[in-house]
A protein has these predicted regions:
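Extended Gly/Ser/Thr-rich low-complexity repeat segments
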Residues: 40-45, 104-113
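Short, internal acidic amphipathic alpha-helical interface segments
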Residues: 49-88, 92
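Short, well-ordered, aromatic-rich surface patches in folded extracellular/luminal domains
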Residues: 113-119
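Charge-rich, low-complexity N-terminal segments
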Residues: 1-36, 75-79, 84
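Flexible helix-coil linker/hinge segments at domain or subdomain boundaries
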Residues: 119-127
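Long, continuous compositionally biased terminal/linker segments
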Residues: 30-58
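Well-ordered alpha/beta subsegment
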Residues: 79, 84-109, 122-123
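Hydrophobic residues embedded in beta-strands of well-ordered beta-sheets
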Residues: 23-26, 46-48, 89
Length: 127
């Protein structure tokens, strides 16, 4: 699955690299955002996840307003979620797909979904 994603990214002139030689994590940047894609066929060959890691960290203050904003975004984008990992917020979109089918449309949709979520989260109307 990540090889298919890498081919798609190459076709649209986006560089990508496997993280630390690990063939289960692929990193790439587009629209000034750093993405991380995960696929582990040994664990579940139908599960594919793409993330925006550490969108907000260290000085993370999850007050009521921030939590409300997260809840609105999580309910608006059904397959996308904002989660807290340690002292950071991550955005994640998860899909169950058949790895033997042509899944090329999933990739631009996932990237667009996370980009939209990111823009909504950091929109001036929410600050």
């Amino acid at each position: 699955m990540l090889n298919k994603l890498q081919r798609y990214l190459s076709d649209v002139n986006i560089n990508s690299n496997f993280v630390h030689g690990n063939n289960r994590l692929l990193e790439f940047s587009t629209n000034s955002l750093n993405f991380l894609a995960e696929y582990n066929p040994d664990s579940d060959p139908t599960y594919f996840r793409i993330m925006l890691p550490r969108i907000q960290s260290e000085d993370l203050q999850l007050d009521k307003e921030a939590l409300d904003r997260i809840m609105v975004i999580n309910s608006t984008y059904k397959v996308g979620k904002i989660i807290r990992i340690g002292k950071s917020l991550w955005m994640s979109a998860e899909f169950f797909i058949n790895p033997t089918e042509n899944n090329m449309l999933v990739f631009p949709r996932a990237i667009s979904l996370l980009t939209d979520m990111y823009n909504d989260y950091f929109s001036p109307s929410h600050e």
